[in-house]
Amino acid sequence: MTGDRGMIIHLVRSGGFGGMRREVRIETLSLPRGEREPLEGLVRAAGFFSLPEKFPKPGKGADFFTYSITVEDGERRHTVEVSQPSLPDGLRPLIREVSKRL
């Protein structure tokens, strides 16, 4: 549980057509409770702090997005880097939700 500390979520999305880079930093304590709790729940549901730091890149393909997402929760800090085709199902809802703020 995050208690009163909240989480800090930093997402960088790069690549895609044109190779654009966009990023967002969310401090969940600054969000209304109705947004904060579901977002923090997505971090927990993804098992984020147990995910590997990097996922294998696909052998073929171009114009995919690459995501680097870092979550800080108190003393814990973890970063995951993954390209769009390698995005695990458990992480998709978190990436989708945070990407809405890009």
What are these regions (language model features)?
Residues M1-L102:
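Function-determining sites in protein domains
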